[in-house]
Amino acid sequence: MAQRIFTLILLLCSTSVFAGLFDAPGRSQFVPADQAFAFDFQQNQHDLNLTWQIKDGYYLYRKQIRITPEHAKIADEQLPQGVWHEDEFYGKSEIYRDRLTLPVTINQASAGATLTVTYQGCADAGFCYPPETKTVPLSEVVANNAASQPVSVSQQEQHTAQLPFSALWALLIGIGIAFTPCVLPMYPLISGIVLGGKQRLSTARALLLTFIYVQGMALTYTALGLVVAAAGLQFQAALQHPYVLIGLAIVFTLLAMSMFGLFTLQLPSSLQTRLTLMSNRQQGGSPGGVFVMGAIAGLICSPCTTAPLSAILLYIAQSGNMWLGGGTLYLYALGMGLPLMLITVFGNRLLPKSGPWMEQVKTAFGFVILALPVFLLERVIGDVWGLRLWSALGVAFFGWAFITSLQAKRGWMRVVQIILLAAALVSVRPLQDWAFGATHTAQTQTHLNFTQIKTVDELNHALVEAKGKPVMLDLYADWCVACKEFEKYTFSDPQVQKALADTVLLQANITANDAQDVALLKHLNVLGLPTILFFDGQGQEHPQARVTGFMDAETFSAHLRDRQP
């Protein structure tokens, strides 16, 4: 008897195990989003911890995590570093696996305040979920100035970290500006004026006077930096608006064009004349007069300094940090003054000879300025188009540098030319992928002629209009990698097209994931994408024919033959 019971148990277990072997190949093997990414939260006064327990074989996208407070003020969230994941269509993305804990600092929360948390993830098998949104109720939190002060600093540091260069770059830019054709030829003249025409000053005295002149110039720039940083605190939000970013991009493009010599930007000549006369009235050779000379010189913007100075001012305005604003422009002025100090002490023998190379330095700064519009527009047009703009800028710069280097006669410049040419070829790759990829995509999209639907009513109407023909509904989204793989590799296959020749093809694009999209997914009981549904001539779905996850052309063709009603 015991042997029979044991045999019966083995039969039952083996039946459950082997039943999976006969499941439909397109049947969903994926868990709901709440199981794939188990979300939880815990609040303790100002401290809130958001946690995700991520199922093995699934991952969350770092850039898709968004937190929006309602009737509450929070510090900018500091997302931890993830691991890199790469796919064919979106390149490298940071993702989280296993477990994610995100601490959030609540500065103030009124009664009934909430936090809206949005996140999105995928499975390694090529199945992506629509963005998930959770509402976190917050306990009332009274604003604490002492607690919020460090948060303000961290926010400023975060804004600064996102900027294209650090404050120390201002020193290098200042040194570089000193070697432009508008500035370098003036240094011997300025040196003579600063020393008051006295030829027998000691080295220490000459160095002291020049240093005082540079400090006067730095004072003007530092004050300008403080003013712009203070204004930036009020207009940081405006600096993130798309229209403002586009406007600034246009302005800096024009400034770059001025560095290329298309036109000249400087103070009105009448104002420059007045400032120059004021400077000339000061007594050279005396510390007080030299300091005033430097302060006035800081107000006279030459055509070569206008564009770089404007770029640094934008950097300061974005940071909103008073110390950073003053310090950055102080370093900029110090960089411009270092060559002057060297010339004053050691004479003109350290001064390079004037020539076409100075115009080339000016042009190179034009390309540096052009990087700012790309940096600004990248926030508006997205990473893909941003990469293409960086590629175009790289091709233009390295191409110009290569052509310019051809004028050199020295043998070692041949190595530099090879490096520049190689850099230009590497830079053009994203543009090449875009050009060939766009053509290929356009061709692929014409292979299957989908009728677009949006709502449940439109789906029902399309099923009625099918008039007895079988219907295939493809659920697609731009954020679904496997959906794009279906478009590129599966739907373009002639065998697949032939198998679908007598089928009405519908497609719902749920990229926006709005209320209508959510209602459609709920109506169809769809967990995520890609999902392809098949309906018979009476408009009834065949659940066994449903496809979830990517299938190549051969597998999908076999599925159509075996499963399509």
UniProtKB/Swiss-Prot annotation:
Keyword entries, A-Z: Cell inner membrane, Cell membrane, Cytochrome c-type biogenesis, Disulfide bond, Electron transport, Membrane, NAD, Oxidoreductase, Redox-active center, Signal, Transmembrane, Transmembrane helix, Transport
The enzyme's E.C. designation: 1.8.1.8
Annotated disulfide bonds: 122-128, 182-304, 480-483
Subcellular location: Cell inner membrane
Listed GO biological process terms: cell redox homeostasis; cytochrome complex assembly
Spans traversing the lipid bilayer: 163-183, 208-228, 243-263, 296-316, 323-343, 357-377, 384-404
SUPFAM superfamilies, A to Z: Thiol:disulfide interchange protein DsbD, N-terminal domain (DsbD-alpha), Thioredoxin-like
CDD domains attached to this UniProt entry: DsbDgamma (cd02953)
Annotated catalysed reactions: [protein]-dithiol + NAD(+) = [protein]-disulfide + NADH + H(+); [protein]-dithiol + NADP(+) = [protein]-disulfide + NADPH + H(+)
PROSITE patterns named in the record: THIOREDOXIN_1, THIOREDOXIN_2
GO molecular function: electron transfer activity; protein-disulfide reductase [NAD(P)H] activity
The keyword Electron transport belongs to this UniProt entry's keyword annotation: yes
Stored InterPro entries: Cyt_c_assmbl_TM_dom (IPR003834), DsbD_gamma (IPR035671), DsbDN (IPR028250), DsbDN_sf (IPR036929), Thiol_diS_interchange_DbsD (IPR022910), Thioredoxin-like_fold (IPR012336), Thioredoxin-like_sf (IPR036249), Thioredoxin_CS (IPR017937)
Signal peptide extent: 1-19
Limits of the Thioredoxin domain: 434-565
GO CC annotations, alphabetized: plasma membrane
Mode of membrane association: Multi-pass membrane protein
Family per record: Belongs to the thioredoxin family. DsbD subfamily.
Protein name (record): Thiol:disulfide interchange protein DsbD
Source organism per UniProt: Shigella boydii serotype 4 (strain Sb227)
Gene designation per UniProt: dsbD
